[in-house]
Amino acid sequence: HDANGLGRRVVIEDDVVIKGKVISSDAEGNVYKSLYIYDGEQAIELRLMNDNYVNYPLGQIVYVKAQGLSLASYMLSLGAAPALEPDGTFPNDTPSEHDFSASGNSNIPTTEMVQQYVYRGELDTITEADVTVVDKDNYKTVLNDDLLGCLIRFEGLRSSYTTVDSNTYPNYLENVNGVYTNKYYQDEGLPITWAYNYDNTKYYGSSLFTYETTPTSLESGSYVVRVSGYARFALKELPADNAMVNITAIYTKYSSRTGGFITYQLLVSSYKDIEEL
């Protein structure tokens, strides 16, 4: 059962239990239907439902019965396993929220089902041991893909209003209706906020933070912070161009299905995890 490679998956057949500490929170609306847990060495995403912070707050120890769940390698995750087609293949016509072809699994669809797989242990706290700290001097040696899904404190990042790989930052993306629409604050005189609400439509905001003097790619040293238009801090003012910040976030990676267009993204649970210097 090789789960390596983009979009690979395997349904767990053995009676396996995973223990971890919750390191993400959806309380402020930026983390969506996901729970990240950390076992002291590596992290994994659990694809669940809304309002996970109620039963699984930050620091909560959880035990996950993995048998019957699907382990996917695109951003290591556990979620619901799709029913196989008669020929043994995975379905490709599932709704977007349950798009197994893209990620290898889907969100466990009900709270009752979640409780069958995810059990609470003791309530702990997030400690220094749970957070990897990087800065401009060590990020090249400390950061690697083994830390994807982990909680990272990026110290001394610089906000950069610039264009990298043909994308201009900050920008605002709407894809709720299946049509991708980018808006740039320069073109439309938009307020410079983490995300945006435009004509009653909520847009994801993408802003760039970097350790590089002149960022030329998003594969090393430059990171995109994506904020949902539904996040409580969506309309908070974005740090000014060249402002210095510390950001504590889940370290994630986006790639096209072919494995190209790699972008490292930072998933922020709370506005307090962004500190302007």
Residue ranges and their predicted role:
Residues 1-32, 36-61, 65-277:
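OB-fold nucleic-acid-binding modules
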